[in-house]
């Protein structure tokens, strides 16, 4: 508040020296009451002072309002608004008076949405702002007076914007009658005439309106609040006029607009126009409708005039409607809309400037007949729209279409009456350009003009405006109907245009973009952006909203193309716009608009009519022409800035569309991942496909495949495709100026810029999550690993998601591969290690391998028991843990036998798969009394199959049903064997058999890399875990000692722990093989410590396990791990020499160590660890996606170093290991 700070100090709650002691309670009460009363009196005094201050402020505000109103009236009379007749002036005066009478209400209603603007009121404005405002007002006044007076005559002579001024002068007598046309406000004609005069300089006329509007849209918001009058819409409207001079600096010339904005310091409007980041800028520009018209008249020749217009327009949007200033009042509501409506837009709309001039010559008739939009600009706010239109993508074009076309558009988009169609179409088209609120204003204006939906629209507008203006607006709209339908029909369209321009601000989506724009564009000095946008959505949303949004996007694209010319980054938006074209097709349901856009420059009235409403909603169909011919310089420039910032600011209507803010809404998952990732999904995604097609056809973007949807370069893809579409078909087809092609290229760069933040951001997180999987070369294995992981634990589930998503990312985000590979290695390892029932997934993934593996194991098991220990035990455990966790009941018998294995599954769970489980079970069954080497070999192979499959069966039932059917069949066999095993269990012989098997694991290793990895890895790990044999032995021994049940209970517990930790353990085991080996044997080890000792002693001959300590085991394990990773990885696709040839060699080489130890206990636990490592490595290598370095130190190391996810997993695994290792140790 401006009030001076008042401090209320309690005078004396208690007198310092009370006359008498406070002996009684009543004395204290009296004293307290007295002090309280004193304080209340003091407060009352302060309140009175505040009220007086407020009264003074209100009086000053009223005075300012009156002066502003008078100024506005004078300005209106000066403006070249033929649409505004004396009636309109009177109406506006009446509206202003009513506004003054309702000053308080208006102020309140305004203050709600203008609250931010109020900050700039004289009371709260910073000195710098005050100076700017003063300068702006002076500039506006001088510019409006001098330029409008001078150019007024000039316009008549030259037929430029000031011709509109002439018209405005004529209508001045009847401004009230055209109050309904306020939307078309005469300013539009002024602008349009200005544009017409500048038709030769396409950039000047359209850019003028664009610049002014853009500038106004952005800055006017601030200005509206800055000016004391802005509180009331009327006052604001006049302020807009006065501010126009300031905004005038926002040149109308297409590209100069930026320069003008910067040079002139056109307040926020200029900067906003320069920096299209803010949707507000566009809106503000749009806002300058009425003033724009004035300014354009005066500004026809000079950018200053245009800026003035823009400023006026901006201010006016704040409260223009309340004043009902001129025919713009309708527009006035959306002051920015008027700006949009300015002839510049129309002029650009009518691609040929000459036609525009021609229309300008006979402003009312010519404009109307030529194209509703243009006729409107010429008659109403031609200059304003012109100025704005250029900058606002293609609004002018759309509106430029003939009234008939406009009508059809209007009917289609807004479903308004065709009779009002001419002006309506403009409005419809305007909404595409204008953000939602702009569209709403257009609707309101058009409806009154058309009379069909005038009541509803004006009401809505009024409600949204929250201003007394609304009633005036309705009246204006009503009178505007005649105006719109007659020569003013063009004016009405002009209004639409002006609205269209603001829509351009929110071109992306009527609903989505509008809100974003309103929010993002603080330019909502007038709440209309949001509220009106909502209105617009309501009114036109059903018909127009989507189409408009789509068209807006298209329009944005078109403009973006131009902007691309100016700046490479804008092309990004252009891309979105192009994508919008596809989006338009789906939403608008009119593919022609895209194609027609080039054709339906303002020149093609038909196209505009049929294509204008929707494409213009996007603003692109019209814009390309408008942009290239007139507004290319300015509009391109302005839009470029807008698009540039658009990447950052998603809420820019066009920018945001291009950026993908709105696009997300439309095409969240349409075609391009980047579209998805980026906020431009809705607009860009739908168009994304089209843009891709276009891209393929035109390959607009320089380093990107045109047809590529490239998730990582979604924007770039969008940019490529959309840009070509807009620039080639629209710009080249309709208006083939060099700017179109130029735009396309710059657009692509912008798109790329936008891409990294949107698509890259989105992708990177997702990619990271699924880094390992995406890199995985074989999705099946990866997925199976993921599935297994899910079985094993929570981590598994996460991995699964990663796997699925990762696969997508792998395909989608090849650009991100560098990152993904790093993560993939560690992640893949973690995945493999994690998968508890890896064998199961492996079966699914490599069912043939599994089928083969059992046979191979059996075959090999008979001749060579070596294979069994390495991988066989671990996978069964892994499956078992899932089985135990998921189906404890189904695995009871097996548990006894599997319990020993249970410790191992965590290690072998990675992808020891069937072979490992079989081997593991084979090992368990080997203990059968029958011949350990040979007899056991068959028994083992059978038992292992059953064992492996039993755990698999339970796990497969839980996780994959059907994959493990055979194992279940074996499970029955396993039952007896398991029982036999406890009896037969001579763990020593079993261990020996395991060693032998581990030494000769060719069958299993030969299995698919993942499957083999477990066997070989366990074999290698057996050597590593030679000191650990007890752990695996302990599980086996546990079966013996516990005979199933005890082991089952303990094993189940341990398995439960391991199952939970198996995914972790897998990665951890690689990190610390000993730990993993210890883990499996924690409970089992305790259960079977004696037998483990025996086993170890017996296996010592093969391995130096007997005297090994835990540290020794760790050392051995790590060493063996390195060997496995080092040896087998380089030699084999399956790291760890899973292949039968590598496997046998490695197993044989390491079998001396691992056979006895691994067979005893390390065989199961260490082998499982090694198997996991090998499996993991095999998976990594198999998934050639991430060619795993053959010389990997260890999965754990890789995980720790490369993947944060892996690091997390390792940490968890380490915890599990510690838990298990401590007990086992």
Swiss-Prot record:
Ranges of Acidic residues composition bias in the record: 841-851
Bias (Basic residues): 552-568
Sites bearing Phosphoserine, chain numbering: 500, 576, 691, 1054
Composition-biased stretches (Low complexity): 675-688, 1156-1166
Residues spanning the signal sequence: none
Entries under Pfam families matching the protein: NHS
Record's compositionally biased regions (Basic and acidic residues): 852-867, 1082-1093
Extent of Polar residues compositional bias: 291-315, 339-350, 710-730, 812-827, 939-968, 1054-1065, 1138-1155
Protein name (Swiss-Prot/TrEMBL): NHS-like protein 2
Gene name in the database record: NHSL2
A biological process from GO: cell differentiation
Similarity comment text for this entry: Belongs to the NHS family.
Region (Disordered): 161-180, 193-213, 291-371, 466-510, 543-632, 670-766, 812-1009, 1042-1093, 1128-1203
The species this protein was found in: Homo sapiens (Human)
Key words, A-Z: Phosphoprotein
């Amino acid at each position: 508040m401006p009030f001076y700070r008042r401090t209320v100090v309690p005078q004396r709650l208690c007198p310092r020296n009370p006359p008498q002691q406070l002996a009684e309670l009543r004395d204290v009460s009296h004293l307290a009451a007295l002090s309280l009363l004193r304080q209340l009196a003091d407060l009352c005094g302060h309140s009175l002072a505040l009220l007086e201050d407020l009264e003074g402020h209100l009086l000053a505000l009223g005075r300012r309002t009156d002066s502003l109103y008078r100024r506005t009236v004078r300005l209106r009379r000066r403006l070249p608004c033929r649409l505004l007749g004396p009636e309109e002036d009177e109406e506006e005066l009446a509206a202003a008076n009513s506004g003054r009478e309702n000053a308080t209400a208006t102020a309140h209603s305004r203050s709600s949405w203008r609250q931010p603007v109020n900050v700039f009121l004289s009371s709260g404005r910073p000195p710098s702002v005050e100076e700017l405002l003063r300068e702006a007002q002076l500039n506006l006044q001088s510019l409006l007076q001098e330029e409008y007076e001078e150019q007024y005559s000039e316009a008549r002579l030259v037929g430029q914007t000031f011709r509109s001024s002439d018209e405005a002068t004529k209508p001045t007598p009847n401004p009230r009658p055209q109050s309904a046309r306020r939307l078309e406000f005469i300013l539009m004609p002024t602008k349009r005439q200005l544009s017409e005069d500048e038709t030769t300089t396409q950039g000047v006329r359209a850019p003028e309106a664009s610049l002014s509007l853009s500038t106004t849209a952005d800055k006017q918001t601030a200005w509206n609040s800055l000016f004391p009058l802005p509180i009331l819409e009327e006052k604001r409207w006049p302020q807009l006029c006065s501010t126009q001079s300031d905004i005038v600096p926002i040149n109308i010339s297409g590209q100069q607009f930026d320069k003008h904005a910067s040079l002139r310091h056109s307040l926020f409007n200029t900067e906003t126009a320069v920096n299209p980041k803010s949707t507000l800028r566009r809106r503000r520009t749009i806002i300058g409708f009425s003033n724009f018209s004035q300014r354009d008249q005066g500004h026809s020749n000079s950018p200053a005039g245009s800026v003035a217009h823009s400023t006026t327009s901006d201010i006016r949007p704040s409260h223009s409607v309340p004043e009902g200033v001129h025919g713009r009042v309708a527009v006035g509501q959306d002051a920015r809309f008027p700006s949009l409506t300015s002839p510049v837009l129309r002029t650009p709309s009518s691609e040929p400037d000459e036609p525009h001039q021609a229309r300008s010559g006979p402003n009312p008739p010519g404009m109307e007949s030529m194209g509703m939009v243009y006729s409107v600009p010429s008659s109403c706010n031609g200059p304003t729209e012109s100025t704005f239109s250029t900058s606002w993508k293609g609004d002018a074009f759309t509106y430029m279409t003939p009234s008939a076309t406009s009508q059809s558009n209007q009917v289609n988009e807004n479903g308004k009456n065709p009779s009002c169609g001419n002006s309506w179409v403009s409005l419809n088209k305007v909404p595409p350009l204008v953000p939602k609120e702009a569209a709403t204003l257009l609707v309101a204006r058009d409806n009154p003009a058309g009379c069909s939906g005038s009541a509803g629209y004006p009401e809505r507008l009024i409600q949204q405006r929250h201003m007394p203006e609304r009633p005036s607006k309705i009246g204006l709209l009503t009178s505007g109907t005649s105006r719109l339908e007659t020569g003013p029909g063009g004016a009405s369209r002009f209004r639409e245009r002006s609205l269209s321009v603001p829509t351009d601000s929110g071109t992306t989506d009527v609903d989505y973009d509008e809100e974003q724009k309103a929010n993002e564009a603080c330019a909502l000095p007038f709440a209309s952006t949001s509220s009106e946008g909502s209105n617009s959505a309501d009114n036109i949303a059903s018909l127009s909203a989507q189409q408009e949004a789509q068209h807006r996007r298209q329009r944005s694209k078109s403009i973006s193309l131009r902007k691309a010319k100016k700046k490479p980054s804008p092309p990004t938006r252009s891309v979105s716009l192009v994508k919008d074209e596809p989006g338009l097709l789906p939403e608008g349901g009119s593919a022609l608009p895209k194609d027609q856009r080039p054709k339906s420059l303002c020149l093609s009235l038909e196209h505009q009519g049929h294509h204008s409403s929707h494409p213009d909603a996007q603003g692109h169909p019209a814009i390309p022409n408008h942009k290239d011919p007139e507004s290319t310089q300015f509009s391109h420039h302005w839009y470029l800035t807008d698009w540039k910032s658009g990447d950052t600011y998603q809420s820019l209507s066009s920018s945001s569309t291009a950026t993908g803010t709105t696009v997300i809404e439309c095409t969240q998952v349409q075609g391009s991942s980047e579209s998805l990732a980026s906020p431009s999904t809705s607009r860009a995604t739908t168009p994304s496909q089209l843009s891709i097609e276009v891209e393929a056809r035109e390959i607009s973007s320089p380093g990107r495949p045109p047809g590529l949807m490239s998730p990582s370069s979604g924007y770039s893809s969008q940019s490529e495709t959309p840009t070509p579409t807009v620039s080639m078909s629209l710009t080249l087809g309709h208006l083939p100026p060099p700017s179109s092609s130029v735009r396309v290229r710059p657009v692509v760069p912008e798109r790329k810029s936008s891409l990294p933040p949107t698509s890259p951001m989105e992708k990177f997180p997702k990619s990271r999550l699924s880094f390992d999987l995406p890199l995985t070369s074989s999705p099946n294995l990866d997925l199976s690993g993921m599935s297994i992981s899910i079985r094993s634990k929570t981590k598994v589930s996460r991995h699964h998601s990663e796997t699925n998503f990762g696969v997508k990312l792998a395909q989608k985000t090849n650009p991100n591969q560098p990152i993904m590979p790093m993560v993939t290695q560690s992640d893949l390892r973690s995945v493999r290690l994690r998968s508890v029932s890896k064998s199961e997934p492996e079966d699914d993934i490599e069912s043939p391998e599994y089928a083969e593996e059992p046979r191979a194991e059996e075959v090999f098991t008979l001749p060579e028991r070596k294979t069994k220990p390495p991988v066989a035990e671990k996978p069964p455990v892994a499956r078992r843990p899932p089985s135990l966790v998921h189906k404890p009941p189904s695995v009871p018998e097996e548990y006894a036998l599997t319990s020993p294995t249970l410790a191992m599954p965590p290690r072998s769970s990675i992808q020891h798969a069937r072979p490992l489980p079989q081997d593991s079970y084979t090992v368990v069954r080997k203990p059968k009394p029958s011949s350990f080497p040979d007899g056991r070999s068959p028994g083992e192979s059978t038992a292992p199959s059953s064992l492996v499959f039993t755990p698999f069966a339970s796990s497969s039932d839980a996780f994959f049903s059907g994959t493990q059917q055979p194992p279940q069949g074996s499970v029955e066999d396993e039952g007896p064997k398991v029982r036999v095993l406890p009896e037969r269990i001579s763990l020593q012989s079993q261990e020996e058999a395991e060693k032998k098997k581990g030494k000769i694991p060719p069958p299993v290793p030969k299995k698919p890399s993942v499957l083999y990895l477990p066997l070989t890895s366990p074999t290698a790990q057996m050597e590593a875990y030679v000191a650990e044999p007890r752990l695996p032995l302990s599980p086996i021994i546990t079966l013996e000692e516990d005979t199933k049940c005890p082991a089952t209970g303990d094993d189940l517990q341990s398995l439960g722990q391991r199952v939970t930790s198996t995914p972790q353990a897998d990665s951890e085991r690689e990190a610390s093989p000993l730990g993993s080996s210890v883990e499996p044997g924690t409970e089992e080890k305790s259960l079977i410590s004696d037998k483990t000792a025996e086993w170890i002693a017996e296996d010592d001959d093969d391995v130096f396990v007997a005297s090994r300590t835990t540290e020794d085991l760790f050392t051995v394990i790590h060493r063996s791990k390195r060997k496995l990773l080092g040896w087998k990885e380089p030699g084999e696709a399956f790291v760890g020499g899973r292949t039968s040839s590598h496997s046998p060699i490695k197993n044989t080489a390491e079998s001396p160590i691992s056979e006895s130890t691994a067979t005893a206990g390390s065989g199961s636990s260490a082998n499982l660890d090694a198997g996991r490592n090998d499996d993991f490595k095999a998976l990594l290598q198999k998934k050639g996606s991430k060619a795993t370095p053959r010389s990997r130190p260890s999965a754990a190391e890789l995980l720790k170093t490369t993947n944060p996810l892996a690091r997390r997993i390792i940490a968890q695994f380490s915890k599990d290991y510690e838990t298990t290792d401590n007990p086992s140790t």
